Amino acid sequence: MGKDQELLEAARTGNVALVEKLLSGRKGGILGGGSGPLPLSNLLSIWRGPNVNCTDSSGYTALHHAALNGHKDIVLKLLQYEASTNVADNKGYFPIHLAAWKGDVEIVKILIHHGPSHSRVNEQNNENETALHCAAQYGHSEVVAVLLEELTDPTIRNSKLETPLDLAALYGRLRVVKMIISAHPNLMSCNTRKHTPLHLAARNGHKAVVQVLLEAGMDVSCQTEKGSALHEAALFGKVDVVRVLLETGIDANIKDSLGRTVLDILKEHPSQKSLQIATLLQEYLEGVGRSTVLEEPVQEDATQETHISSPVESPSQKTKSETVTGELSKLLDEIKLCQEKDYSFEDLCHTISDHYLDNLSKISEEELGKNGSQSVRTSSTINLSPGEVEEEDDDENTCGPSGLWEALTPCNGCRNLGFPMLAQESYPKKRNYTMEIVPSASLDTFPSENENFLCDLMDTAVTKKPCSLEIARAPSPRTDNASEVAVTTPGTSNHRNSSTGPTPDCSPPSPDTALKNIVKVIRPQPKQRTSIVSSLDFHRMNHNQEYFEINTSTGCTSFTASPPASPPTSSVGTTEVKNEGTNHTDDLSRQDDNDPPKEYDPGQFAGLLHGSSPACESPENPFHLYGKREQCEKGQDEVSLANSPLPFKQSPIENNSEPLVKKIKPKVVSRTIFHKKSNQLENHTIVGTRSTRSGSRNGDQWVMNAGGFVERACTLGRIRSLPKALIDMHLSKSVSKSDSDLIAYPSNEKTSRVNWSESSTAEHSSKGNSERTPSFTSEWEEIDKIMSSIDVGINNELKEMNGETTRPRCPVQTVGQWLESIGLPQYENHLMANGFDNVQFMGSNVMEDQDLLEIGILNSGHRQRILQAIQLLPKMRPIGHDGYHPTSVAEWLDSIELGDYTKAFLINGYTSMDLLKKIWEVELINVLKINLIGHRKRILASLGDRLHDDPPQKPPRSITLREPSGNHTPPQLSPSLSQSTYTTGGSLDVPHIIMQGDARRRRNENYFDDIPRSKLERQMAQTGDWGEPSITLRPPNEATASTPVQYWQHHPEKLIFQSCDYKAFYLGSMLIKELRGTESTQDACAKMRANCQKSTEQMKKVPTIILSVSYKGVKFIDATNKNIIAEHEIRNISCAAQDPEDLSTFAYITKDLKSNHHYCHVFTAFDVNLAYEIILTLGQAFEVAYQLALQARKGGHSSTLPESFENKPSKPIPKPRVSIRKSVDLLHASHTGQEPSERHTEEALRKF
């Protein structure tokens, strides 16, 4: 790479030594002092050194990279060498924007004060945002304080008309809101018609921010086109904010721009929240100061409870309901009526404007812990550093770069709609979730007439949106019962109030850096998804209850009846799911609401193991148990199903995903406790039970995932899939014959065959079991057959697995965790940025000491420690070592987790594994453009000992194709230089290696099927319109020995009757004073590239042209207006070659007959393949013209000769001095005289 690129990479990775080395030549003449003349060596180093303000493709300078990645020392070093702080990237971001976005207060101070270049604090990006916007949005209060001290203008609005105060209020940055209000209280009155800080805070439920704004003097009744802040809070279900606004004295009769009051809004969105808000408005209008229907303060216990008083059971509330206004009564009735109907998630979303959806992303505190009949609490399973957790007040939460996973939510608009049963599951698919359902004992819910429609509405919502919704809260119809859902999400910070603000809707400014950071965060997470929280149907009944327990920790399932723990009117139903000893998820399933309620004897456990729907794939949850507890006969106290595996039936697989196989850890404890009424049917869903068996080999466990996945999770090592035969067998056996989701449990006379371990399982009887009905008998026979088939296949595979050679495996961990374990966490960026981003592919056969040195780890002691730790990592096993032979390139790349390169391999002709086994590293660099050394080493290690052709030898220096002489003899190739002149010892010839690889790819029989050609040419080739070629062409390797290619690109008639058109960038032309063949093209390419790289303005001026190649020559066509600019006849083209430094750049030399000068024209193609095809097509055009000349002369029809081959005296061009890769030397004789087609060639090109 060039020095500019080295400087950018060093600044990004934090390599201070390399930055100092690259910029050291400037010292002394720029800032080093001294008034004497500069030494010549210093002048030369300045000339050759990198540009300190050079940019990459995204417009980032080295200072951008250093500021974004927090490299303080490099920022100081760059400023010392006069790096400019006021250069914007392609999106208009200045370095101070990135430092403020990152929250690095030290770098912000350096950029402002250090100099010699000082940042201007009010600079705006393309979105009109200042650095204060970035800091305020992400809650970086220290940076905000610095910027306010530097007199940053807080009244500047971005393209969405948002001030920094608006952003801080929108995202709940309480501390920032207080700071800005304190510094500029006049902002309270600077509002637009679209929004105010109060509206934005109310919309997202930031209660504390709303209170601060009101205390600071903001008008509570200020209005926008959306109405008052009460409209916003009511629309999004923010009950706490509604209460605060009402207590402050807001006018509830204000109308929005559409003439709607708050009550009208609630009518349009019937939900549990709407019911609560309507009741609150009722009390407010009646003069009640404090609500009795909202939740009580959070208990000190870890479980947050919601208390809702029942208006029916409370005499005082009965009195109030009788005196309610007619409008409110009508509203409440309409809400209840609408809830009985099928209201889907889409119906609710369609009424919300796009502006709201763009700004909402995270679950607010009402959704997480304070409102509704259930609460959700978020806790962290990953220890975050202190810098990643910002200690804020009630509504504060960390966002921005320290929590990059938050920015990955696929939808920022649907997370927080304020409706009680809907919250989008929008976390990345590689995250773990642990759901815990704990119904509380002392919660009062709404009256009995509300019981059924709440559950029906919840089931309808789940059914209509299974793929993107997570049922976060299920309202409980029981008067003495309610549920609570606890969500554990890795990667989230643990706050006191468990609330999270919405994720900002702007992506990180740096695409390259953000991608690397995101990969670093996501990569270590297991590949699994979450399921959907099932609905819990608790019916309000005053009957005795019995409690049953399912214990699966020892491989058995038992139901034990026990006396009720409390009187029937206040008895507690607790459903609890816990995971002990494992990090896997117990997913929660839902019961299909199309199942008709049926009654069965209690001995027939009505449970069925279903596959999760394709919309909520849950690879880690093997079983979903749907339980329906029936009326129990008197005197029946215990149902025991110990050591009897639960039956399961596989749902038809509706997706095409290939099943995987994993093992899970042993000793997984799942415990489910539920209560049972003695004389009333109740529906429960038993959630997250994982069946485990004792006695399996090596303590491993095979689990069938019901969504079409057989998975195997192990404590050590990588996940590998089972043979395809086993998977095919599993798929073929996955059938479902019953339309019902209920199935009877097998009787005690039937031996269960669901035995996943080698030891047999004892049969246990079930008291009171009745005979199975005939309809279930046939189903169980089918299930027994399925279990037998799967059991045989799994046991056979276990034997094969146990027969393999065992070896140490490393725990699945990130590169950062691995470096932390060896005490060198500072090198994480070095490894990640250079492709060493997966511990599973960093064994001793992948990483070497030289690699560590190249990526900037200069400390020899640290390198030695890393190399010692690498010895403990597993070596990469080459393909074929353990019987694994990938059948396709895509499969092989996926196996080494480099699937992103699949397209690059295929479009460059590497379409089979046989071709890959002969690939060289230089091809990975120059052809495939794989710049990360870690990825290259991983690829080569995976390929193992590859089959190369014979050691490449350098080709002859030049081959001259001459025109026929006067005696009409065929042209002769010039004598080749002796091969003994070039030895293969010491180094390989890189150009020839690449040409060999290209020849291998083009020998592939299907290669030409993939070659992009013109539409007309493809049609004519398919229909045979070309017919047999009228002339016979010599293959390229016979026409010139400088290329080993054996096939031309096009049909000869294509170049005779039509032309081959290619689009490219024209970099310019250079006068050739001394014609030296490919050396001249090489010099011209280097000069033209250097001119274009000097400035971005120069690059913007590079025109796009179309090269139209035929046997007559090359036409320059303006790609914009399709005008012909100039023509170069084939006889005047001397040499065509690719640039060895950049294979996408090529050039050819032509002679201007008017001035008798030679010019080299330089182009850049869109990719390497296109450049090579253009060069080869030029060679084919000459061959076609030459063969036509031969045919004409043999037939004596001199008049039909192409004008390029009329008999004229000729003299050969001197041989080029060096060889060049993939070049076609079209060295012709020069002719005197001027043809009409050449009269304005060079003049037109120079003007162009």
UniProtKB/Swiss-Prot annotation:
State the post-translational modifications: Isoform 3 nuclear translocation requires an NMDAR-dependent proteolytic cleavage.
Q: What is the superkingdom listed in this entry's lineage? A: Eukaryota
Report the induction information: Transcriptionally up-regulated in t(1:19) pre-B cell acute lymphocytic leukemia by the chimeric TCF3-PBX1. Not expressed in pre-B cell that lack this translocation.
* Phosphotyrosine modifications at: 901, 1007
| GO CC entries | Cajal body; centrosome; cytosol; dendritic spine; nucleoplasm; plasma membrane; postsynaptic density
Basic and acidic residues: bias regions: 577-601, 1236-1248
Q: Which InterPro entries does its entry note?
A: ANKS1/Caskin, Ankyrin_rpt, Ankyrin_rpt-contain_sf, PH-like_dom_sf, PTB/PI_dom, SAM, SAM/pointed_sf, SAM_ANKS1_repeat1
Q: Which Gene3D superfamilies match?
A: Ankyrin repeat-containing domain, Pleckstrin-homology domain (PH domain)/Phosphotyrosine-binding domain (PTB), Transcription Factor, Ets-1
Residue ranges of every copy of the PID domain listed in the record: 1056-1213
Q: Where are the ANK repeats?
A: 2-31, 58-87, 91-120, 127-156, 160-189, 193-222, 225-254
- What keywords are assigned to this protein? ANK repeat, Cell projection, Cytoplasm, Nucleus, Phosphoprotein, Repeat, Synapse
One Pfam family this sequence matches: Ank_2
Q: Where is the composition biased (Polar residues)?
A: 305-322, 371-384, 753-763
Task: Show the ranges annotated as biased composition (Acidic residues).
Answer: 388-397
**Quick check: keyword Repeat in the entry?**
yes
- Phosphoserine is found on 309-310, 314, 353, 364, 507, 510, 738, 775, 974
Provide the tissue specificity: Highly expressed in marrow from patients with pre-B ALL associated with the t(1;19) translocation. Strongly expressed in brain and testis. Expressed in fetal brain. Isoform 4 is highly expressed in brain (at protein level). Isoform 6 is expressed in brain and several cancer cell lines.
Region Disordered: start and end of each range? 296-322, 367-400, 474-514, 558-623, 749-777, 944-989, 1197-1248
Q: Where in the cell is it found?
A: Cytoplasm
GO molecular function list? ephrin receptor binding
At which positions is motif Nuclear localization signal? 935-938
The protein's role, per its UniProt record: Isoform 2 may participate in the regulation of nucleoplasmic coilin protein interactions in neuronal and transformed cells. Isoform 3 can regulate global protein synthesis by altering nucleolar numbers.
On subunit structure and binding partners, the annotation says: Isoform 3 interacts with DLG4. Interacts with EPHA8. Isoform 2 interacts with COIL. Isoform 4 interacts with APP and EPHA8. Isoform 6 interacts with EPHA8.
Q: Which PANTHER family match?
A: ANKYRIN REPEAT AND STERILE ALPHA MOTIF DOMAIN-CONTAINING PROTEIN 1 (PTHR24174), ANKYRIN REPEAT AND STERILE ALPHA MOTIF DOMAIN-CONTAINING PROTEIN 1B (PTHR24174:SF3)
Q: What is this protein called?
A: Ankyrin repeat and sterile alpha motif domain-containing protein 1B
What is the primary gene name for this protein? Answer: ANKS1B
